Structures are given as structure tokens and as C-alpha cells.
Regions:
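Bacterial N-terminal signal peptides that target proteins for export
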Residues: 1-7
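Alpha-helix boundary/capping and short turn/kink residues
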Residues: 91-92, 161, 212, 261
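Ser/Thr/Asn(+Pro)-rich, low-complexity disordered segments
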Residues: 23-147, 151-160, 166-183, 319-508
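N-terminal low-complexity, intrinsically disordered patches enriched in charged
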Residues: 15-17, 393
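Bacterial N-terminal signal peptides
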Residues: 8-15
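Extracellular polysaccharide-recognition and catalytic grooves
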Residues: 154, 169-355
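Boundary at the C-terminal end of the N-terminal hydrophobic targeting segment
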Residues: 19-21
Length: 508
């Protein structure tokens, strides 16, 4: 009885608190942006305009002429991001183009109840409808519910006067389908950090708009579960990802700006601050990169691919020092720069001490971070080389094509470009880093990829990697060693091993 009373009291307090936390538009305009944010926003919009198809009312995939047969030539999610940017800019013709795009995006939502993909969207209009029992991510992407849904919510909060009532009604209905579909699919966990944060905001937004008390109660419990999991170690389960940390920051900014209660806003602000400090501790401004280890990574050099953390940092750093490459249609993962309108509206809130670390290297330091009960990340951040390792208590392996890289090294080569090493394949693994290098424990086959301009394959042997600007001494018990060329890199494989030490020394 006491427990029921306590739960009821918490819910009552949550509902009462909703009246204390008003959600108001930020009224951001290009003129009100600071220089760096405005430059980023303009680059994003210029690329959108370059790739927009006025007949289809969607943006083309960058490089679509070479990839269309494999992935489709249009991007539904990213088109919704362009629409938000158009409404923000509000130049002549922007409102109509945004309305056309939003109409086209909404037509790509799966609206048949009772299927697992209900409420999500086609990734491209060329994508066939799922049939039978499709494999998640291949047959459909459930996360488009949240990437697109949160964008629609931002439009409805910020620019209700710039769209028609009919379009607004359709957008609210689309958000409801997304929430209903996610609830019924039941696949999402609070540990799936970036999606869990977006879902928490979107669920709260829909609950308040619909005056749905069940959703209000459930969304409040969801946000608390995400926060509670984070606070165990002040870390997200998807740890240290230059792309998905950027989505985490987006979700947290939605909480702190648009959360319907002071509680949501407060815990969103708290987690956002902690996350920025964590990012800053791994960042080396001389190398313009966040060190590994990476739980999920699409690249190893933020000077050559677009990471969403890099997009965030570009809003407060000049182009010449931000961890972001020049923006062109050919830039790796360039579509993520289309996240810029969201960031421009929400604003970048980096704690002052963390911001200083992003501008000036403050000295060599060791990092040791508990992620979960089983997982610990370690890294050595020095002036000329950064490297990290993740110990998993032998609970995680690294499969072919994995985004998980539990051992990484980055440095600047004599050419001026970033060189890197990433562990790309391993059985259950533990890796730890300190100022001397990386120690690895894994029984079986371990593979690394090494990339560095002017790398000579003949200078890479089992016991020593003589790389441009870096020397790594290897102490291992492997039974076999092999090396092969892989595009602009080399793959090296140690088979039949149990332990290995990489002794890392920058060549001055």
C-alpha cells in the first residue's frame, strides 16, 4: 500500500511540475547566430541546396550517382533536417520548400498498424516495403521514428506559424504513430543511449500535446531509467563514439530545452555537462581528434570524416581548429553535417573548463573510466600521440565490420596528416592503455588496420611497426603473423595468440 502511494505521489508531482516548465521557441535566426555557428549552418544549407531535387522534394544522397543502385539516391531523414533549416532561415521561398519536403517525408512513413515497422519511415523512397519477418536495420530502420520525429517536434515548437494547420496536424499524427510503433515493437532499451534519449523527449512531447496521462507516466519513468543507468558510472553504455556522442548531445539538448518538467530539464543539463567534460578529456586539439577506445566509430580521423561531435564543436571553434574536414559532397559521412540546423537552434553548452581543453592542449594525462560493471576505458593523451584501450572482462568481441574498436592509436605523420591504428577483429578481449602503450589479452586471432601516408609495408613486421612518425614495438606470443594490403592501409593479423603489448613511442 505504501509503495502504491509513493508511486502515485511521484506521478502527481511529475504532472504538477509540468505546469512549471514552459516550452518556448528560441527564436534563433542566422543573424543572431555567432560566427562559427552561422558559417556551419550556411555550409550545411548550401550542400542541401546543391543536392535538392525539386521534382521529388527530397535531397539526394551525397555521391548518389555512384551509390544509388545500392542505397537509393534520396535521403528521407536528412530531407527533414533540411526542412528545419529552411524554416529557421525563412528566406523568400523557404517556407514553401520546407512544406513540400515535409509533405514528401510524411508520405514515407509506414502507417499500417500491427507490423513491427509501424511508425518508422523508409530510408529512401526507392526502398521496398518490408515483408514477412524482415531483419531490423536491413529491411527497415526503426530509429528513423526518432530522428525524424524529433525534427518534426522541433518544427512544431519553433515554427508553428510558418507551416499550415493541416501540415501541423499531419506531423502530430506522425509523431503519435512513431511513439505507438516503438511502444508496440518493444525493442528499445535505456542502454541504447542515443535513441533512448531522443525517444524520451519525443514521448514526453507527444504525451503533453495529447494530454495522454498514461504516456506522461510512462515517459517520465523512461527518462528516469535512462538517467539512473547513466548515473551508475556517469557514462553512457555506448561509450566514446564521435558520431553517437553527437546524437547523445542532441537528445540531451532536447531534454534541457524542451522537457515538459523542471526535472527533465535539470537531468538533461546535468548529463550534457558531464558528457562534454568526458569528450574534452579524450580530445587533443593538436591532433584535432578524440582518442579511442571507441564503442562505435565510423572513422579514425575527424579531420577526414564528419562526426557529429565534430559538427557540435565546429559551432564554437573556427574551421581551422575544429575537428571537422572541409565540407563537400565527396567528404566521408558528409550528410551528418545536415544536423547543423538542430544544433544552431538548441545551442552548444560546453562547461568552461572543458572548452579550454578543446582550444589548448593542457598536458599529457592518463584516463581511466568505468563504463559498466565489466567495462573500463583507459587512454593516454599526450602532445603528439593518443591511444586507448577497453577492458571488457572478456565479455565483448570484435567481429568483422564491427564499429567497436577496443584498441586505437592516432598521431600526426610527417606529411601533416593523421595516421592511425585500429583493432578490427578479436575474440573476447581486454585492452588497457597507459603511458607506455597498450596491453591486450585475447585468445585466438587479432587483426589490426594501420593507415598512414607514406607507410612502407616492408617496415611492418611481427615485432616492430616502423610507421611514419611513430614506432611501435610488439611483444606477443602469436603462433602466426601475416600482413596484406587493404586499400590505403595495411591489415596485420596475429593468430594463435593470448597476450600482446604494443610499446608506443612517437618519433621526433
Amino acid at each position: 500500500m505504501k509503495r502504491r502511494y509513493a508511486i502515485g505521489l511521484v506521478f502527481l508531482l511529475v504532472c504538477v511540475a509540468r505546469s512549471d516548465a514552459s516550452v518556448t521557441p528560441r527564436h534563433v535566426t542566422p543573424a543572431s547566430m555567432d560566427k562559427n555557428t552561422r558559417e556551419l549552418f550556411q555550409e550545411s544549407m548550401d550542400l542541401d541546396a546543391q543536392l535538392y531535387d525539386d521534382n521529388v522534394k527530397l535531397v539526394h544522397r551525397p555521391g548518389f550517382r555512384s551509390t544509388a543502385s545500392r542505397t537509393g539516391s534520396y535521403m528521407v531523414r536528412e530531407s527533414s533536417w533540411y526542412a528545419l533549416g529552411l524554416l529557421l532561415r525563412d528566406a523568400p521561398g523557404d517556407r514553401q520548400r520546407a512544406a513540400d519536403i515535409l509533405d514528401a517525408v510524411l508520405k514515407q512513413q509506414y502507417v499500417t498498424p500491427g507490423v513491427k515497422w509501424y511508425g518508422t519511415y523508409r530510408r529512401t523512397p526507392e526502398e521496398p516495403d518490408p515483408t514477412g519477418n524482415p531483419v531490423m536495420w536491413r529491411g527497415y530502420d526503426p530509429n528513423w521514428r526518432h530522428f525524424i520525429g524529433t525534427t518534426l517536434a522541433m518544427v512544431l515548437i519553433e515554427y508553428p506559424d510558418r507551416i499550415s494547420p493541416e501540415l501541423a496536424k499531419r506531423m502530430y499524427e506522425a509523431i503519435d504513430r512513431a511513439i505507438d510503433g516503438e511502444m508496440k515493437e518493444g525493442r528499445l532499451l535505456p542502454s541504447y543511449s542515443n535513441i533512448a534519449l531522443m525517444y524520451g523527449f519525443l514521448w514526453d512531447f507527444a504525451a503533453v500535446h495529447d494530454k495522454n496521462t498514461d504516456w506522461q507516466k510512462q515517459s517520465a519513468a523512461w527518462t528516469e531509467s535512462v538517467y539512473g543507468l547513466f548515473k551508475k558510472y556517469d557514462a553512457f553504455f555506448e561509450y566514446n563514439s564521435p558520431t553517437y556522442y553527437g546524437v547523445d548531445l542532441y537528445g540531451l539538448a532536447l531534454w534541457r530545452d524542451y522537457g515538459s518538467t523542471k526535472r527533465i530539464q535539470t537531468i538533461g543539463t546535468e548529463m550534457e555537462s558531464i558528457l562534454w567534460k568526458d569528450i574534452a578529456s579524450y580530445y587533443n586539439p593538436r591532433l584535432r581528434n578524440v582518442s579511442g577506445p571507441y564503442d562505435r566509430s565510423y572513422g579514425m580521423d575527424q579531420e577526414s570524416y564528419v562526426s557529429i561531435v565534430g559538427v557540435w564543436m565546429r559551432t564554437v571553434l573556427d574551421a581551422k581548429i575544429a575537428p571537422l574536414p572541409p565540407i563537400a559532397a565527396s567528404t566521408d559521412h558528409v550528410a551528418d553535417v545536415w544536423f547543423a540546423p538542430h544544433l544552431a537552434i538548441l545551442g552548444t553548452r560546453i562547461p568552461p573548463d572543458a572548452f579550454e581543453k578543446m582550444k589548448k592542449f593542457e598536458g599529457d594525462h592518463q584516463l581511466h573510466k568505468q563504463i559498466t560493471e565489466d567495462r573500463v576505458a583507459t587512454a593516454w593523451i599526450s602532445r603528439d600521440v593518443i591511444f586507448g584501450g577497453e577492458s571488457t572482462n572478456k565479455t565483448k568481441d570484435v567481429g568483422t565490420g564491427s564499429q567497436f574498436h577496443p584498441a586505437t592509436v592516432q598521431w600526426r605523420t610527417p606529411s601533416g596528416e593523421i595516421g592511425w591504428v585500429q583493432l578490427t577483429q578479436a575474440p573476447m578481449i581486454d585492452a588497457t592503455a597507459d603511458e607506455h602503450g597498450i596491453k591486450i589479452s585475447a585468445t585466438g586471432t587479432v587483426r589490426f588496420r594501420i593507415h598512414a601516408k607514406d607507410l612502407a609495408q616492408t617496415k611492418v613486421s611481427e615485432k616492430e611497426w616502423e610507421l611514419p612518425g611513430l614506432r611501435i614495438a610488439v611483444d606477443d606470443d602469436a603462433k602466426n603473423f601475416s600482413i596484406e594490403k587493404a586499400d590505403d592501409a595495411v591489415d596485420i593479423t596475429y593468430s594463435g595468440m593470448t597476450v600482446m603489448t604494443l610499446g608506443i613511442n612517437a618519433a621526433h
